[in-house]
Amino acid sequence: MTHLLIVAIGFIIALPAQVFPGEADVTGVEVRQTASRIFHFDVTVRHDDSGWDHYADKWDVLAPDGTVLGIRTLYHPHVDEQPFTRSLSGVEISETISEVSVRAHDSVHAYGGKTVTVALPR
């Protein structure tokens, strides 16, 4: 009986993590230079979108000091497309910056998921 109770409590504790989406994670970043100081980003995001009430709604390109260099708004949930990749072109980045970080945002938790840092090709 004690064993059954422990299993039931474990299931109840673990259930919300599987039923409710967590934070949005960046799982991949590809970047290429398209012109002098201009870059194109292909970013893969993973988030268990549940619909319009909770979904990954944007990702940002950040300088090492935290300055936002580019924002890719995601206009709808990706419930049946996980992970998903979206692009952002025309991101101007100073020659003094050698790497950037990409973070994702969701409509409930804001930021907090996995961030990826990449070196800029020059």
Predicted regions and their residues:
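Bacterial N-terminal signal peptides
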Residues: H3-A14
